From Swiss-Prot:
Gene name linked to the record: rpoE
GO biological process, one term: regulation of DNA-templated transcription
Name this polypeptide is given: Probable DNA-directed RNA polymerase subunit delta
Species per Swiss-Prot/TrEMBL record: Streptococcus pyogenes serotype M1
NCBIfam families for this protein: RNAP_delt_lowGC
GO molecular function term, any single one: DNA-directed RNA polymerase activity
Keyword tags: DNA-directed RNA polymerase, Nucleotidyltransferase, Transcription, Transferase
InterPro entries referenced in this protein's UniProt entry, alphabetically: Asxl_HARE-HTH (IPR007759), RNAP_delta_N_dom_sf (IPR038087), RpoE (IPR029757)
Length: 191
């Protein structure tokens, strides 16, 4: 592979990001590359060993994500941001998401390692059937036939309980003399 951009430069002095940008520019807009293919092309161009690429791979991937000139297109495909207008970037991502919606994915059953073999453990993921019964019954309020106070208002209930303790006939009428209270307030305390 020959990249005209780097003609006359030492390959050992080039960074993987520079080479990745040049490879994608040479391929053109409709030829996005998978990350693994891009890394293989870079390795072939720079002539690096497998161990050297493995060592540089995390740094390259970080640079690829943080460099503003690259854009992830989903499914680990990469392209150059300059290929896409801002509005078109959203459209590309949305069409990729719509394509994925058509394929049904199997749901994985979650396994809790701490619950295995422990019969006394409480599984909080399941709804408690007692809670469901409680909410259904709370909607319908039923009164006890034996206790007529349930149907009365709280004030009536309180009055009837007081009458059981002290019958109404035994209450004494108390006259409140408001003038006396006003006179007491007007007087100043003696020191």
């Amino acid at each position: 592979m020959k990249l005209d951009v780097f003609a006359g430069q030492e390959k050992s002095e080039l960074s993987m990001i520079e080479v990745a940008r040049a490879i994608l520019e040479e391929r053109g807009r409709d030829n996005e590359m998978y990350f693994s293919d891009l890394v293989n092309e870079i390795q072939n161009y720079l002539g690096k060993s497998d161990a050297g690429i493995r060592h540089a791979l995390p740094f390259f991937y970080t640079d690829l994500n943080t460099d503003g000139s690259f854009i992830p297109l989903g499914e680990n495909k990469w392209g150059l941001r300059s290929w896409y207008a801002i509005d078109e970037i959203d459209e590309e991502i949305i069409t990729l998401e719509e394509d994925e919606d058509g394929a049904q994915k199997r749901k994985k059953k979650r396994v809790n390692a701490f619950m295995d073999g422990d019969e006394d453990a409480i599984d909080y993921r399941d709804d408690d059937p007692e809670d469901e019964d409680f909410t259904e019954e709370s909607a319908e309020v039923e009164y006890d036939e034996e206790d007529p106070d349930d149907e009365k208002s709280e004030v009536e209930s309180y009055d009837s309980e007081l009458n059981e303790i002290i019958p109404e006939d035994d209450f004494e009428e108390v006259d409140i003399n408001e003038e006396d209270e006003e006179d007491e307030e007007d007087e100043e305390p003696v020191l």
